[in-house]
Amino acid sequence: MASAFSKLLTGRNASLLFTTLGTSALTTGYLLNRQKVSADAREQHKLFPPSADYPDLRKHNNCMAECLTPTIYAKLRNKMTPSGYTLDQCIQTGVDNPGHPFIKTVGMVAGDEESYEVFADLFDPVIKLRHNGYDPRLMKHPADLDASKITHGQFDERYVLSSRVRTGRSIRGLSLPPACSRAERREVENVAITALGGLKGDLAGRYYKLSEMTEQDQQRLIDDHFLFDKPVSPLLTCAGMARDWPDARGIWHNYDKTFLIWINEEDHTRVISMEKGGNMKRVFERFCRGLKEVERLIQERGWEFMWNERLGYILTCPSNLGTGLRAGVHVRIPKLSKDPRFSKILENLRLQKRGTGGVDTAAVADVYDISNIDRIGRSEVELVQIVIDGVNYLVDCEKKLERGQDIKVPPPLPQFGRK
């Protein structure tokens, strides 16, 4: 895996840095700083045994708390990634936030690509618990961005108000948001907007820096579901992802506002395709086309996305590993949402519901945000098809209830194939 330093010393950066600082000075300064951070942290830990540092998780209800044991903690506490990220930094957000009233949170984050390897003894069981039994030690993640395979992708627009597909991508060699320095965060922004400037046709657009927006402009974009919210979530702040806000954060979108990229929120980038109405097939086609083009432009400039065959695309939160994909709709289902079988129907269809404005919001006028619950172990095409088939089933149930007919709880979807 490429480290931040090795990436720094590639391509166009190398000659400038070597000329300015000299090879020896640059190398020595960087490595000594990393070594000092690691040595200081290790010496501090040696003062107390792991049992004295073990967090009190007795009242916690998140995946990390369920999987962490004193034995695992003792094994991993003094380990560090090459960038100096520790186990305690990984789990701090889950220690500070015991649980969530509506969803079971993960309770830990990665500070860099190497976190998933160095702390695999905890990450692997957390991933298996969160992702419906997917075992990263035994399984390989499939990928498929062929939108032509999608069927029945047009919803009844009397019920479905909008459609959206999003994912995240991380730039290899740079620390993830919980651990990145200001320089790394600014480099992510620079790499992304330089590449995005190469998009053409209906994907062409421009970048808007958060620091240059007025409060009114920011809030309007948030209210219209185009921009990420302000960093008020304790899950975000406790993980260190709100540091230096709004430095090097922003949104890029095409001129139609149907293809968007968030920069430096929870992940390096979030890639989004969205539009009003129920044409999920068109939304997914634009998503696939735009995502492939963004990756090509990134690679042309000497960078690449974090990926491996076990975990798929590497992102900050383990909940988004694999595809990182969430395909969702805003759907109005007043009768079905009040039916006691609603939650079981969603569970069997591998769907989850959120309020109209997302997590921690209420459903306004009986409009719910319905999306796939899985991210890894199934391809992008499979997940979008699951959402299409599932939402069509929900709409069919709503129509039956309107006519006074009974509805059935569907059988559970089969487990993803083991590969």
Curated annotation (Swiss-Prot):
GO terms for molecular function: ATP binding; cardiolipin binding; creatine kinase activity. Residues 1-39 form a transit peptide. It comes from the Eukaryota. Sarcomere-specific. Found only in heart and skeletal muscles. Residues 40-64 are annotated as: Cardiolipin-binding. InterPro entries: ATP-guanido_PTrfase, ATP-guanido_PTrfase_AS, ATP-guanido_PTrfase_cat, ATP-guanido_PTrfase_N, ATP-guanido_PTrfase_N_sf, Gln_synth/guanido_kin_cat_dom. It is a peripheral membrane protein. The modification Phosphotyrosine is found at residue 255. It holds the Pfam family ATP-gua_PtransN. The modification Phosphothreonine is found at residue 356. It catalyses: creatine + ATP = N-phosphocreatine + ADP + H(+). Residues 46-132 form the Phosphagen kinase N-terminal domain. GO terms for biological process: heart development; phosphocreatine biosynthetic process; skeletal muscle tissue development. CDD domains: creatine_kinase_like. Its EC number is 2.7.3.2. It is found in: Mitochondrion inner membrane. Keywords: ATP-binding, Kinase, Membrane, Mitochondrion, Mitochondrion inner membrane, Nucleotide-binding, Phosphoprotein, Transferase, Transit peptide. Signal peptide: none annotated. Residues 159-401 form the Phosphagen kinase C-terminal domain. ATP binds at residues 162-166, 225, 270, 326, 354-359, 369. Its main location: mitochondrion. Reversibly catalyzes the transfer of phosphate between ATP and various phosphogens (e.g. creatine phosphate). Creatine kinase isoenzymes play a central role in energy transduction in tissues with large, fluctuating energy demands, such as skeletal muscle, heart, brain and spermatozoa. Belongs to the ATP:guanido phosphotransferase family. PANTHER family: ARGININE OR CREATINE KINASE (PTHR11547), CREATINE KINASE S-TYPE, MITOCHONDRIAL (PTHR11547:SF19). Mitochondrial creatine kinase binds cardiolipin. This is Creatine kinase S-type, mitochondrial. It comes from Rattus norvegicus.
